[in-house]
């Protein structure tokens, strides 16, 4: 059973939405669920080095890298690279896969569950 998490929000926007999505991804993976993450809109900053978390806030870029290191595939909207996030135009770090809407569509179609954050 595959679960796709689509993230949209900026990592450090004053809410816990993105943080909770990453926590859920970690727990699902730990529970043996096949987890996939697709980053679009301002959430693409999770795939970029250079974002410093505010004091007292967990480093969500590090959380994303840890998920990748554990084998969770993370694909990142290519169009959003130029248009979205605090670091517009900055490339993505190794392990975060540059992707397309067609690949997002394929993941949606082949996933048992799709959750959006």
Question: Which residue ranges define each predicted feature?
Answer:
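Short, active-site-adjacent cap segments at secondary-structure transitions
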Residues: 44-47, 83-84
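Short glycine-enriched, charge-decorated loop/helix-capping segments at active-site entrances
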Residues: 50-55, 91-94
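Residues at the starts of beta-strands that form the adenosine-phosphate
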Residues: 2, 30-36, 73
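Short internal beta-strands
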Residues: 25, 35-40, 74-78
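Short, glycine-rich nucleotide/cofactor-binding loops
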Residues: 3-19, 47-52
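A glycine-rich helix N-cap at a beta->alpha junction
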Residues: 53-81
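Histidine-anchored nucleotide/phosphate-binding helix
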Residues: 17-30, 37
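C-terminal structural segments of small proteins and small subunits
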Residues: 84-117
């Amino acid at each position: 059973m595959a679960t796709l998490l689509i993230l949209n929000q900026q990592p450090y926007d004053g809410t816990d939405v993105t943080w909770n999505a990453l926590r859920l991804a970690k727990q699902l993976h730990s529970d043996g669920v096949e987890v996939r993450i697709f980053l679009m809109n301002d959430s693409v900053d999770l795939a970029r080095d250079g974002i410093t978390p505010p004091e007292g806030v967990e480093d969500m870029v590090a959380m994303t890298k840890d998920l990748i290191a554990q084998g969770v595939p993370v694909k990142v909207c290519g169009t959003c690279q130029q248009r979205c996030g605090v670091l517009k135009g900055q490339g993505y770090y190794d392990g975060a896969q540059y992707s397309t809407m067609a690949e997002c569509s394929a993941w949606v179609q082949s996933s048992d569950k799709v959750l959006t954050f």
